[in-house]
């Protein structure tokens, strides 16, 4: 079974959604046969690569809110994150461009498949939300990526050029083709789409449904009671 997850490094609900799908997988009987692949999505492709303002200020300006109103919204998200064991510092996060972070997530998949890609994704989310670091800054990105397991030389090569940019854009185009208007967005076996950071129970239901459909059980229409057969204890005579 394959789960594709579209998310952005600066999306607070994406980190929450990550924890919830992980919780669902922890209770899923066939979790060891599930592949999780991270896809790129940018909430604001035009955001600056050199940030100049806090996310809270940008949101207040964008939605016409007062600073107090923006703070209340952030407090609510932080409370939900805490329920999932996450520590957010939203009042300190910066409004920034995530294309380079996404390019390193693609590098993670190239170097170590879904497992290493997931480690890079987790490290970047933690750096942004828990540590309030500037994940558009190349020095920060290099430090986080190398600590997560990426090869330093390749990290430098990617950050110095445009490698994987087309992959990032292709992921975004695919999400739009699926009808996704926001993130997180989950697609299970290219068949079921789940929008938003749904409760773990919702993910569990979809996982069970998708698994049962891809691994159907044979319906037995006639049993041994109506016809002779052999079993562990011998054959009917």
Task: Give the residues covered by each predicted segment.
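C-terminal cap of thioredoxin/glutaredoxin-like
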Residues: 3-30, 105-106, 110-237
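Structural alpha/beta surface segment adjacent to cysteine/selenocysteine redox centers
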Residues: 19-127, 230, 235
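Short, well-ordered beta-strand elements
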Residues: 1-6, 37-39
């Amino acid at each position: 079974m394959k789960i594709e997850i579209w998310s952005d490094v600066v999306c607070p609900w994406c980190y929450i959604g990550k924890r919830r799908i992980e919780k669902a997988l922890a209770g899923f009987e066939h979790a060891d046969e599930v592949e999780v692949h991270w896809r790129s999505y940018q909430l604001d492709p035009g955001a600056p690569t050199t940030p100049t303002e806090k996310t809270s200020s940008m949101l207040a300006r964008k939605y016409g809110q007062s600073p107090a109103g923006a703070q209340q919204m952030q407090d609510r998200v932080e409370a939900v994150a805490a329920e999932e064991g996450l520590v957010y510092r939203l009042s300190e996060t910066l409004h920034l461009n995530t294309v380079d972070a996404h390019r390193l997530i693609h590098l993670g998949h190239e170097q170590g498949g879904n497992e290493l890609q997931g480690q890079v994704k987790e490290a970047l989310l933690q750096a942004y939300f828990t540590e309030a670091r500037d994940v558009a800054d190349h020095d920060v990105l290099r430090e986080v990526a190398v600590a997560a397991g990426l090869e330093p030389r390749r990290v430098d090569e990617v950050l110095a050029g445009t490698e994987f940019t087309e992959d990032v854009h292709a992921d975004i185009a695919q999400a739009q083709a699926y009808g996704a208007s926001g993130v997180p967005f989950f697609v299970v076996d290219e068949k079921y789409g789940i929008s938003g950071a749904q409760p773990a129970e919702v993910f569990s239901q979809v996982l069970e449904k998708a698994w049962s459909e891809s691994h159907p059980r044979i319906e037995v229409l006639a049993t041994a009671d109506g016809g002779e057969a052999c079993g562990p204890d011998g054959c009917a005579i």
